[in-house]
């Protein structure tokens, strides 16, 4: 079986959201988390989803799962005190519910731009090599104020 563990147990402190955690902020009328879950819901190789959530938002998450017909969500578990603990809770639940030989993909709930091909390639890589990780090139902007710098020293 292929299981997605989606961790969305953060509060969005760095984003400084006042009313709700960032995974519930809406884009075009839909929470970011739903876009992420839909990518795994629509993937034909994903058998089930474990959602790791802030305990106080589990009820609201259930409402979203019903509203958007996210039928592959097999369980919602409370997150831990940090991301690592939240992932542990999700993987532990996957181990309780599914065979040990299952492929488990771990994905951040506020990263909705995952695509079908990336999910498929990760599953294939895990089956072939035992593990996989998705990376993309980092593009960063450098800002230097009130100084002149020789352009040869800025990469």
Named regions from a protein language model:
Residues 10-13, 55-57, 82, 109-112, ...:
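Short glycine-rich anion-binding loops that position phosphate/pyrophosphate groups of nucleotides
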Residues 4-6, 51, 106, 131-134:
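Structural beta-sheet core signal
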Residues 2-58:
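N-terminal glycine-rich phosphate-binding loop and ensuing alpha1 helix
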